[in-house]
Amino acid sequence: MFVRALSLRDFRSWDALGLTLRPGCTVFVGPNGHGKTNVLEALGYLSTLSSHRVSSDAPLIRTGTGQAFAGATVVNAGRELTVDLELNEGKSNRARINQSPTRRPREILGILQTVLFAPEDLSLVRGDPGDRRRYLDELLTSRIPRMAAVRADYDRVLRQRSALLKTAGGALRRVSRGSGRPSEDGASALATLEVWDGHLAAHGAQLLAGRLHLVHDLAPHLAESYQSLAPESRPASIRYRSSLGSSLPPEFTEPARVPEAGDIAFLEERFLQELSVMRSKEIERGVCLVGPHRDDLELHLGDTPAKGFASHGESWSFALSLRLAGFALLRSDGSDPVLMLDDVFAELDRRRRRALAKVALDAEQVLITAAVPEDVPEELDAVRFGVEARDTDRGRISHIVEEPEDRSDG
């Protein structure tokens, strides 16, 4: 798989960009803050419908405009598809495949597969569980695009059920203070909570089963990737931690366990059981305490948790290993995702640079950003684009320029 053409309009600092790309290695070179990462961010958004840098779409739309556009022509096994995405301020985003509008933007998922490693990925090791859940869900959706709908349904039910818990909790607190019977809204919330329990368990079981299967498939690739980056270090491992607690047998979260056909039904049953156990606590606190939104991916070096105990170098290696493991997993599925490396070589020592360069040489297409050409290993033999931002009366605008060394010669 490779991106043959990329076009941007009013995306971040780019008012307009049209690039023709080719397989192999391409490097975007320029000072920090001049728009290099925005190019990779746009491709990442077309791949995952999310940014690795911000949680909302608003910062992606260039200041002073109400709409951003990103489009890419993707070649996969000889088949060419063009995906376009409009990001609209205050309105729903719109997507097209080969100029034909889609019903929902998520229908473009799976056309472009990317694996991006960026400095922000250190949060996979040192950050909150939400960073690791997002990593799992993006990789899961890349493998199985229909899981995006499962996650969307789960999030919708979660919001509704959380609102009911707040209403029910408030009603019961008023009763406990002697202010009479629960309000009509409170009584209605209590009555319908069981129905929403069923919806949450049904969607949550599908999402949980998908994540567990993913961790099972990912674990050996993670161990191998970390070993290649840090052969003298302790072995790296991962394990899923579920909020279902004692309702879920411990062996269910063992990465070595082979997923079975009946897992979803079993997980749904255990999900309902744990919701029943936690009902009073959830109503008291007004939040949903059970489900994939409360789970985590545990990272270990030997017997020690990586978070809080790994050195800076070990944390970098673990974060990079998670991305490389995802890349290897997608390739084992028969895909060859676009590998994107955002200003990472400068952060790595010589051994890790060599190990990463070896992976990059084997990929069909690699897109790299670097502040200076010397940050990129020579063996990658890359095509280079210079990137520069200029201040204008329309704000700061990025441009493709001649390579930095060519300009200095002139």
UniProtKB/Swiss-Prot annotation:
Q: Which UniProt keywords apply?
A: ATP-binding, Cytoplasm, DNA damage, DNA repair, DNA replication, DNA-binding, Nucleotide-binding, SOS response
Annotated compartments: Cytoplasm
Q: Where does ATP bind?
A: 30-37
The answer to whether UniProt assigns keyword Nucleotide-binding to this entry is yes
What domain of life?
A: Bacteria
Q: Which SUPFAM superfamilies match?
A: P-loop containing nucleoside triphosphate hydrolases (SSF52540)
Q: Tell me which GO cellular component terms the UniProt record holds.
A: cytoplasm
Q: Name one Pfam family in it.
A: SMC_N
Keyword flag Secreted = no
**GO term, biological process aspect, one:** SOS response
Question: Which GO molecular function terms does the record list?
Answer: ATP binding; single-stranded DNA binding
* Protein's job: The RecF protein is involved in DNA metabolism; it is required for DNA replication and normal SOS inducibility. RecF binds preferentially to single-stranded, linear DNA. It also seems to bind ATP.
The family annotation for this protein states:
Belongs to the RecF family.
This protein's name: DNA replication and repair protein RecF
